[in-house]
Amino acid sequence: MTEYILETNALTKHYRKFSALNGLTMHIPKGSIYGFVGRNGAGKTTLIRLICGLQEPSGGEYTLCGVKNTDKKIISCRRKMGAVVESPAIYSEMTAEENLKQQSHILRTSGVENISELLELVGLGDTGKKKVKNFSLGMRQRLGIAIALAGNPQFLVLDEPINGLDPQGIIEIRELILKLNRERGITVLISSHILDELSR
């Protein structure tokens, strides 16, 4: 029997003058890489904001790791999830290491000793002492993914991770996602409006 890390059932999000999501039903198998593709404004970011608990649905429901969104246990389930929503939440005046230390402090994890390992994992091993304001867009995306990995998640959610990247940057992010899935068994949900780049 297939085990799903995320299931949505007729999930809906209405705003005053429009619907961002209208009855979305989807199932993401544990251990998969799942591409969520649609044009800009199709509701991809809205879905991600809902499952991250940043907004409440107008209708329908979802389960995360088998727990319904209406169950109080959903809060602890979200701790098994790492996300980069819209753009990475990073501090430009801090170094890469300081950004990761800050996230470890927020999550109350004892992950300080794993910071160099995380930076190495995302291809930023030699940049830990550099201020983020000097990073390229691709480096910022990779640091955002490292921060999302700080809590050792089972489920990684990436909102438009290749947006604005050059061809080499797209290749690097795609290879990183495959590596995380194969070597760490992390389930990945990727939203993108570029079907061709996502599916290669």
Where are these regions (language model features)?
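Catalytic Walker B motif of ABC-type/P-loop ATPase nucleotide-binding domains
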Residues: 156-160
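Helical segment within the ABC ATPase nucleotide-binding domain
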Residues: 171-184
